[in-house]
Every structure is written in C-alpha cells, then in structure tokens.
A protein has these predicted regions:
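Short amphipathic alpha-helix that is part of the acyltransferase structural core
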Residues: 1-28, 49
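Active-site rim helix/loop that mediates acceptor-substrate recognition in acyltransferases
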Residues: 23-43, 57
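Conserved beta-strand in the GNAT
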Residues: 44, 51-60, 70, 75
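A conserved beta-turn-beta hairpin within the catalytic core of GNAT-like acetyltransferases
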Residues: 61-71, 81, 125
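Conserved acetyl-CoA-binding loop-helix of GNAT-fold acetyltransferases
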Residues: 76, 82-95
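Conserved active-site alpha-helix within GNAT-family acetyltransferase domains
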Residues: 87, 103, 111-133
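Conserved GNAT acetyl-CoA-binding A-motif
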Residues: 97-109
Length: 133
C-alpha cells in the first residue's frame, strides 16, 4: 500500500468514493479549490495496481495562539475495508499534524464509529453543534 498526497487527477475517483461512503450527490464535482488550498492536505491510499482504495483529509486551522488539525472525510471503498487502510491514512494525518505544530487533532464521526477512533487514541470531548446552510 502506498499513501500519497492526492492529485487533481484523483478527483473523479475521490468523488466516487465520497458518494459510496457518505451518499453525497453524484452530480457534484470535486472543487479544484480543495486541491489548491495550502491549509488542506488530502491523502489517498493506493494498492500495488494503482487503484485508489481510500482517502482522508486534514484541514489546518490557525487559532489565536495555536493551531489545530481537523481530520475529515475518512473513507475507504467497501471492497477494500478491513485492511487497515483508514488506520494508516489517519496515522499519516496525525504525523502531518505534529509536523505542522498542531496542539491537537479533532474529527467528527457517527456514534457507530466511536470505538474505531477510540482504538486510535481519540477521546470523546464536548459536543459539536451544526447549522446546515
């Protein structure tokens, strides 16, 4: 397995992955701004045949006196699940967060997935509120 930074040419496969994993709109293309944002890193996991198996992204947020990493959109194609692809992607994003001097890494998840992230060292803290626009 190879973990690398996503390229703009990966966007159509990443869109398919997001559709499968999260049920996103199939007609909505990936934004090129996502790949050009200097505070965002998207990693992909690729097998030995060059197939994209999963992806995850890190968004750096500069606060007043410190920086945090936000992990988003961790997804693995169903046919590749159970091979620690998500774990490897998350661990790489955690390393990247440390290299970027983040004091913490946060993520949002469904309640069904809590134990998955707890095994990686994450703990439930606070409660996120959201207003969909």
């Amino acid at each position: 397995m190879i973990i690398r930074k996503a390229k703009m040419t990966d966007s159509s496969v990443i869109s398919l992955l997001m559709n499968e994993a999260f049920g996103w709109e199939k007609t909505k293309p990936s934004s090129s701004l996502f790949f050009l944002n200097k505070n965002t890193t998207c990693l992909v996991a690729e097998n030995d045949h060059g197939e994209l198996m999963g992806s995850a992204s890190l968004h750096l947020l500069q606060k007043i006196n410190r920086r945090i990493g936000i992990i988003e959109d961790v997804a693995v194609f169903e046919k590749f699940r159970g091979n620690k692809i998500g774990v490897n992607l998350i661990n790489e994003l955690i390393k990247l967060s440390k290299n970027e001097d983040c004091y913490k890494v946060i993520l949002n998840t469904k309640l069904d997935n809590l134990s998955y992230y707890e095994k990686l060292g994450f703990v439930s803290k606070e409660l996120q509120m959201e207003l969909r626009l």
